[in-house]
């Protein structure tokens, strides 16, 4: 491998969504992360609860309250991944899948969610059904989620760059990149580009735009 490294012009990044996977990949020679899928981080117990609260909330205030619960979890995940890849780029994809993938579709799960949120099962079912789509692969997902609910993009941006700043203060060299997913037309990107800088104006980390 040392001989290959001496002559190669090709570098290999990995796909990794956890600090452990990032560390393993680096030990095998990966020089960064080409795709870090943030949706995979939301399926642990407390995270999925907060995620579902955010999705099923009927108000912006309710979504922001749930996202405030998710923020420290996201920051912790990104901290571990960026630390494992110290000095190498980590390309983080903002939330991509349609929201119906995160909500309970079984009656038992819906009853539990109703109890946790203090609303009726019928209301939970109504909100879950409202998320169904004719073409979920190209519908309300990716950048369109971020444009409909910019508070999601804001939370993830704060988590990514907040983790990077913490590592900088500790003497590490984090190299975060943010991917805005599923852009169809430039207007969709423009809307997200308005949200992302506002989310880190209170932070002190040099950033650059790559399209």
Task: State each model region's role.
Residues 2-205, 209:
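Conserved alpha/beta-domain cores
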